């Protein structure tokens, strides 16, 4: 099923121009919170793929036990080893506040793990993001955190959740979705019950849904100003069945998180008037970012699989990110 033309046109509007008018940082600054002793690849893939998809700066906020490995993977990443188990909450909070002031979006979850201290820091970061009205992507063990306390994310319409099959089943049960509900409608139900967050349900085809008709959807708590509350009550589902690769390997979901984060960072730059015509509403950005991220990541996977076949690993996707972006959106009117 083709993506509606209006969606594609809106996505292209939030992509920064490559015309020499912007300085460093105005094409997106992404942060990834995750990375502990056992998990160093996931935050790298999320943060580095954001660079490959076109952001200017990419930061990793991690535990000290992960920092050395992540730094060694690429000199292009800015690594902050502040999630120290022995640090005081006040110290970490102060450091997070300083870092968040420099970012357009925070991706929480890749390599986060389930250690209590990492989960606690993720909860803290999410609360600070909400206070600042930043865009937010939640994946992997950040979804585990949400499942244990739905209030962490409920009503925050600047967020995108990216569950895989297992994570979506668990999340559906936790919010109370009827197990007999049609499969293609469940993501919309989860969105409504979580107050209008955008849900990107990964699968053979990706289902992106947003439903802001429930009572929990909150424009003011989402820092969406000047919008008509009635017009903002929407139900929308987009199925993305762009061809992807046939090999599944650990890390591809992290690439998706980085790509969605890229488009959300651009959405923030667009919202702030750094470039663009201002015709795309702020409330559209999470849906557009999820659709665009799905399209580009699936295309990246297809291109990498065509070269590597059964031997494909996630690193193979990174060199295909730029060409995949061009294939999906590239070239016209001075844009990426």
UniProtKB/Swiss-Prot annotation:
Pfam families: Carb_kinase
Lineage of producing organism: Eukaryota, Fungi, Dikarya, Basidiomycota, Agaricomycotina
Coiled-coil region list: none
Swiss-Prot/TrEMBL catalytic activity: (6S)-NADHX + ATP = ADP + phosphate + NADH + H(+); (6S)-NADPHX + ATP = ADP + phosphate + NADPH + H(+)
PROSITE patterns (UniProt xref): YJEF_C_2, YJEF_C_3
Function: Catalyzes the dehydration of the S-form of NAD(P)HX at the expense of ATP, which is converted to ADP. Together with NAD(P)HX epimerase, which catalyzes the epimerization of the S- and R-forms, the enzyme allows the repair of both epimers of NAD(P)HX, a damaged form of NAD(P)H that is a result of enzymatic or heat-dependent hydration.
Named cofactor requirement(s): Mg(2+)
Residues given in the record as ATP binding sites: 202-206, 244-253
Protein transport as UniProt keyword: no
Documented EC number(s): 4.2.1.93
Organism: Coprinopsis cinerea (strain Okayama-7 / 130 / ATCC MYA-4618 / FGSC 9003) (Inky cap fungus)
GO CC terms in record: cytoplasm
One annotated GO biological process: metabolite repair
Record-stated family: Belongs to the NnrD/CARKD family.
Protein's cellular compartments: Cytoplasm
InterPro entries given in the database record: Carbohydrate_kinase_pred_CS, CARKD, Ribokinase-like
Record-given protein name: ATP-dependent (S)-NAD(P)H-hydrate dehydratase
């Amino acid at each position: 099923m083709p993506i509606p033309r209006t969606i594609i046109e809106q996505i292209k509007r939030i992509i920064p121009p490559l015309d020499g008018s912007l300085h460093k940082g105005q094409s997106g600054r992404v942060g990834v919170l995750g990375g502990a002793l056992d998990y160093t690849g996931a935050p790298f893939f999320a943060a580095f793929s954001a660079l490959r998809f076109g952001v200017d700066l990419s930061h990793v906020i991690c535990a000290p036990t992960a920092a050395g490995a992540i730094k060694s993977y690429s000199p292009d990443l800015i690594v902050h080893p502040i999630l120290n188990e022995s640090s005081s909450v006040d110290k970490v909070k102060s450091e997070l506040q300083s870092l968040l002031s420099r970012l357009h979006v925070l991706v929480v979850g890749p390599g986060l793990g389930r250690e209590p201290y990492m989960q606690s820091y993720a909860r803290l970061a999410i609360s600070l993001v909400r206070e600042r009205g930043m865009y937010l992507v939640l994946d992997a063990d950040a979804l585990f955190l949400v499942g244990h306390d739905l209030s962490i994310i409920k009503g925050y319409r600047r967020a995108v959740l990216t569950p895989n099959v297992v994570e979506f089943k668990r999340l559906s049960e936790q919010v109370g979705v009827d197990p007999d509900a049609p499969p293609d409608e469940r993501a919309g139900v989860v969105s409504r019950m979580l107050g209008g967050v955008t849900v990107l349900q990964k699968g053979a085809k990706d289902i992106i849904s947003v439903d802001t008709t429930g009572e929990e959807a909150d424009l003011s708590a989402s820092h969406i100003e000047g919008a008509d509350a009635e017009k903002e009550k929407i139900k929308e589902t987009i199925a993305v069945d762009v061809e992807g690769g046939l090999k599944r390997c650990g890390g591809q979901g992290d690439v998706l998180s980085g790509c969605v984060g890229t488009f959300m960072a651009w959405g923030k730059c667009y919202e702030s008037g750094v470039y663009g015509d201002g015709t795309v509403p702020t409330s559209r950005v999470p849906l557009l970012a999820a659709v665009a991220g799905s399209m580009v990541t699936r295309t990246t996977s297809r291109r990498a699989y065509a070269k590597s076949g059964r031997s494909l690993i996630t690193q193979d996707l990174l060199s295909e990110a730029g060409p995949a972006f061009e294939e999906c959106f590239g070239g016209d009117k001075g844009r990426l």
